[in-house]
Amino acid sequence: MYTSLISIKEKYELLAQELTKLEIFNDIKKYTKIQKEHASIEDIAIAFINYLAAESSYNLSKEILQNEKDEELIALAKEDIDEQSTLMQKLEQELKELLLPQDENDNKNVIMEIRGAAGGDEGDIFSGDLFKMYQKFCEANDFKIKIVDSVYGTAGGYSRIVFIVKGEKVFSKLKFERGVHRVQRVPQTETQGRVHTSTATVTVLPEVDDDVKIEIRPEDIEVDVFRSSGAGGQSVNTTDSAVRITHKKTGIIVTSQDERSQIMNRETALKILKAKLYEIEVKKREEEEQGLRKLAGTGDRSEKIRTYNYPQDRITDHRIGFSLSLKNVMEGNLDKIIDALIADEKALKIKAAGF
């Protein structure tokens, strides 16, 4: 790790020198490239520079402690050793985390889909509750939500809702929501007060950059157009502006009906299809390279990542055994759970890296 950090520091300092040269401003493309590269390693380089400074001060105080007889200087040296030791431990942990391979999708916008799974109408109602939770979370984090497609449940909620979330590092936070969410509560239609268990599945996909090559040939898809309702189902569109695209080979069906025109709906549907096909390609590559077992989300009750227990006002994330007040989380306060999941992911990566 130390050798890697030395190389990063030297590269950072070299790039900083390049950015001070007057001639670099004559080539904007080169300047932008160097500036971007410089910024990408700045956090690691600065942390390591601070670590080296703390280490130097620590060693100097150690030397004073060994050779000095003045009690006041000895006391100051001991105090500095404690301070620098604490700082070095903190910076070492920070450097380990910064050196971990970053998820290339963390800065991307996301495409989310919520479906009612087990439990019939109650599963659909719960899907609606989850969507409201994500709406509040996104509002608190200045993320923008745009509904692409929705199918209302017969008793409320959604049997399916698809939406795009845009904002800074959206995927880094919402990627942990993917999986089966289980709810335990007494449905409004339950006359004997019995607790029912239902589930909803949440899919989270990163938006695929335009420069990523995912071939979608006209002969590979079937495009249907139909009359759509407006956003939220409040107004009926009198033209066939909604678009449904079926990918013949995979059977993936994507619908977009909340854009203003058929052209825009087609573009949005193709964007979602591209993200789904890219996900399949990435999973296939991972299985080939790492021998990973493909986990298919079926919405089965046993494949749960989180349980929402209404009678006990408790939400539990089973991946990390973390519990919080359900009422608070349903108001969009997901940060504590997400922060705990991020910390757990970092710890696993550090362990795997052998730091």
Swiss-Prot record:
Modified residues (N5-methylglutamine): 234
Annotated signal peptide: none
Subcellular location as annotated: Cytoplasm
InterPro entries, per database record: PCRF (IPR005139), Pep_chain_release_fac_I (IPR000352), Pep_chain_release_fac_I_sf (IPR045853), Prokaryotic/Mito_RF (IPR050057), RF-1 (IPR004373)
Summary of the function given for this chain in its UniProt record: Peptide chain release factor 1 directs the termination of translation in response to the peptide chain termination codons UAG and UAA.
Coiled-coil annotated residue ranges, if any: none
Source organism superkingdom: Bacteria
Chief place of localization: cytoplasm
Entry-linked PROSITE patterns: RF_PROK_I
Family listed: Belongs to the prokaryotic/mitochondrial release factor family.
This protein's GO CC annotations: cytoplasm
Keywords assigned: Cytoplasm, Methylation, Protein biosynthesis
Listed name of the protein: Peptide chain release factor 1
One Gene Ontology MF term: translation release factor activity, codon specific
Modifications made to the protein after synthesis: Methylated by PrmC. Methylation increases the termination efficiency of RF1.
NCBIfam families from the UniProt entry: prfA, PRK00591.1
